[in-house]
Amino acid sequence: MTQDHIVTERPPATRNDTAGNATARTYEVRTLGCLMNAHDSERMAGLLEDAGYIKADPGAPADLVVFNTCAVRENADNKLYGSLAHLAPIKASRPGMQIAVGGCLAQKDRHIVLDRAPWVDVVFGTHNIGSLPVLLERSRHNQDAQVEILESLRTFPSALPAARDSAYAAWVSISVGCNNSCTFCIVPSLRGKEADRRPGDILAEVQALVEQGVLEVTLLGQNVNSYGVNFADPDPSTGEEPLPRDRGAFAQLLRACGRIEGLERIRFTSPHPAEFTDDVILAMAETPAVCPHLHMPLQSGSDQILKAMRRSYRRDRYLGIIDKVRAAIPHAAITTDIIVGFPGETEHDFEQTLDVVQKARFTSAFTFQYSPRPGTPAADMPDQIPKNVVQQRFERLVALQERISLESNRSLVGTRQELLVVAGEGRKNATTARISGRARDGRLVHFRPDSADGSVRPGDLVDVEITDAAPHHLIADGPLLQHRRTPAGDASERGQTPTTRGVGLGVPRITVAQAQIPSSGTHPDTACR
């Protein structure tokens, strides 16, 4: 195999039905973990559909089940192996059924997955998503499990076709990998060092999505505001020059996305406080399409714990960023991530976290109980906190944040909010007939359409007046103030989602039949937040 190409074939994704007729094989992708994983799952689905598979109907048994896994939290491990155990007898009763395990846990536990679940057919990692169809066919042909884990990225996942889940909102990856070394996190060792997509390629993908009706994009990266430190090399066929390091690249990217006609909402996740710069705040404030929402992980409010976590910022730095954001964008919603019970966390350390939460007045927070992950420095630290202490602190933190969230949401009662109508995110019952939408600042709003005739569709935009509030959502039970039907709503009504082909990304493309594929065995290279 040459170094310039990763090779794919178009394997025959068919099976025989009960009458002996060849029919397309069905697939299901189950995602565990973060937004990066969810976006990778869209790429896996796109690859499979490109190879001839069709998506299984909800609740119907699939001929292929793919797990895209997470290695950050223990419950993701438990969920994976519990699901695999549940599938074992189903697979035994369905000749030809296949199971594949990919993602961060597969990258980390490459030698363990088959020991614990020998009925798995394919194990692949974070760096070779594009190999999935070939590995499935090789396993089927050889009647043997295939394990292929690469140690470095050859192709950006965004170079692969995608089967998007939504007609109106899309994720767009701007980088992969991470250059930080947080002691609780295993992602850098699984996804590698940061590599940034070239801005022209990102903008081309966003433009293609908008042309298909998408109204909102979320720019994804492990650390979006370090974008520009390591641009990928250009595709040699383009004749483009390599791009120099550019610390202002993320702010420039936000402004450039904001100039794309038809793109109404821009979000991004997640920035790192240590590298958050004033030019990004200015770009957020001056670009109308950028939503007034900042999700910025805190992790702890104690300088001592932040140092132990290797977070490379301190509480005053964090609070200073929030002050600047609120000065420039007074109505911004600010959300965060917090870990409780990190090794060595004292009661004073925890009270420091509560103090930052009080001062920051987060709109909402994702709160987690620390769990040691093998392979991370924190797992071997002394002074691991007893479970009962962690639970008690967790409950105190949640109670405080719930109170702050409710106060924040109540402050919006009586205000007018523009909502992007969403599918599957809220309450809808026979009594209220409510459906749901997301405000520009990201808050979930349950509202009552003027009629139940389906004229308000996912992807449409509506204006409502907020009538009530709860910690995790808002209510708008009055009449609609405005309803704008959109091309995204038209597509949603038709059940149509955008399709994106590979865009030139400055790393080797997947190409068809440019070198010989080994017919069996393990690839020689075998071995996140």
From Swiss-Prot:
Pfam family, one: Radical_SAM
Principal location class: cytoplasm
Cofactor comment text: Binds 2 [4Fe-4S] clusters. One cluster is coordinated with 3 cysteines and an exchangeable S-adenosyl-L-methionine.
Cofactor(s) required for function per UniProt: [4Fe-4S] cluster
Region (Disordered): 1-21, 481-504
Domain Radical SAM core span(s) in chain numbering: 164-407
SMART domains attached to this UniProt entry: Elp3
Domain MTTase N-terminal span(s) in chain numbering: 25-141
Ranges in coiled-coil conformation: none
Catalytic reactions of this protein: N(6)-dimethylallyladenosine(37) in tRNA + (sulfur carrier)-SH + AH2 + 2 S-adenosyl-L-methionine = 2-methylsulfanyl-N(6)-dimethylallyladenosine(37) in tRNA + (sulfur carrier)-H + 5'-deoxyadenosine + L-methionine + A + S-adenosyl-L-homocysteine + 2 H(+)
UniProt cross-references to Gene3D superfamilies, sorted A to Z: Methylthiotransferase, N-terminal domain (3.40.50.12160), tm_1862 like domain (3.80.30.20)
Domain TRAM, residue spans: 410-480
Compartments, record wording: Cytoplasm
Role, per record: Catalyzes the methylthiolation of N6-(dimethylallyl)adenosine (i(6)A), leading to the formation of 2-methylthio-N6-(dimethylallyl)adenosine (ms(2)i(6)A) at position 37 in tRNAs that read codons beginning with uridine.
PANTHER family the record matches: CDK5 REGULATORY SUBUNIT-ASSOCIATED PROTEIN 1 (PTHR43020), MITOCHONDRIAL TRNA METHYLTHIOTRANSFERASE CDK5RAP1 (PTHR43020:SF2)
Protein name listed in UniProt: tRNA-2-methylthio-N(6)-dimethylallyladenosine synthase 1
